[in-house]
Amino acid sequence: MLDNYRQHVAERAALGIPPLPLTAKQTAELIELLKNPPAGEEQNLVELLTHRVPAGVDDAAKVKASYLAAVALGKEACALISRAKATELLGTMLGGYNIGPLVELLDDAEIGTIAADALKKTLLMFDAFHDVKEKADRGNANAKSVMQSWADAEWFTSRPELPESLTITVFKVPGETNTDDLSPAPDATTRPDIPMHALAMLKNKRDGAAFEPEEDGKRGPVKFIESLKDKGHLVAYVGDVVGTGSSRKSATNSVLWFTGEDIPFVPNKRFGGVCLGNKIAPIFYNTMEDAGALPIELDVSKMEMGDVVELRPYEGKAIKNGEVIAEFEVKSDVLFDEVRAGGRIPLIIGRGLTAKA
């Protein structure tokens, strides 16, 4: 399994992208290896289980959560993963198959507090909310602390605020970029594989652009965008008109692949990033909001490719070389909360949870 996986890693690295997340079958094989680790591979196996299995309600997540639950509940012993570590890892899986075991672990004298810390940052509780409430009503101290944390919105306040000032490097795409430029229809089959699909972003030659596709019609300016990151700042997608055309979450995924940051413990997905345009199409604006990005409409005429620009989101100013080059107002101050929460969707679900608690 490891040999096959490493070959796959090498093939993907040649394309400049990370490996695919592990499948349910690979995850099951990985767990067998964890039970009886080959010498020298111990750390790698734990890393793979920690960072390369999808979260949520994926088939592989089910396999991972079942095993971690068995270890956390003391039904299985694992030399490489303690009960406490297994509980922590369950807490990184967002929702779905990890919730039941974490709620059960609130009763555990040794690791109940670890389960509580995990649930405090978990928003996708749905009906399991009532199970936590019942335990709290019966006097379970861990469940009470979870309810209190949700009521105090610690899932939100524990995250950093959007800073007063952001330094960005401009990746400027002249003219109108529609969602087919960002997520081409002929490449639709790769859309679920976000890093692979992102290679097709801007794959066709554009008039007046300061970049060339690496392979016209096949591969976009991947290395060019990477070279902009070498300046050490966030790279912002900047265009005259951005995101017109059909609604495609995949278009946002591709932009965020190059401009966002990794979602911790979730393979091959990113969030955040900055997108600037004279005009940003409404549906594209919304999908950016959902993903925790900062989309701002402002005059981008004085921003050129590779410029380093200071963005002051609360003041509504963009500054280059000490001079204000554009002023703006965000569409709603809620945008700043959405960015802090990691997206509009977590903000909505989190607020609901806090209101209930």
Regions found by a protein language model. Give the residues of each.
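Structural detector for internal amphipathic alpha-helices that build alpha-solenoid repeat scaffolds
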Residues: L15-L20, E42-D59, L73, L80-G95, ...
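Amphipathic alpha-helical scaffolding segments comprising HEAT/armadillo-like alpha-solenoid repeats
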Residues: A24-E32, A55-K75, M93-D107, M125-A136
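Short helix-loop boundary/capping segments at the starts of domains
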Residues: N36-A39, H51-D58, A188, W257, ...
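Short inter-helical turns and helix N-cap capping residues of alpha-solenoid HEAT/ARM repeat scaffolds
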Residues: P38, C78-A79, D107-I111, G139-N140
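Fe-S-dependent hydro-lyases/dehydratases of central metabolism
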Residues: N98, L102, D107, A115-A357
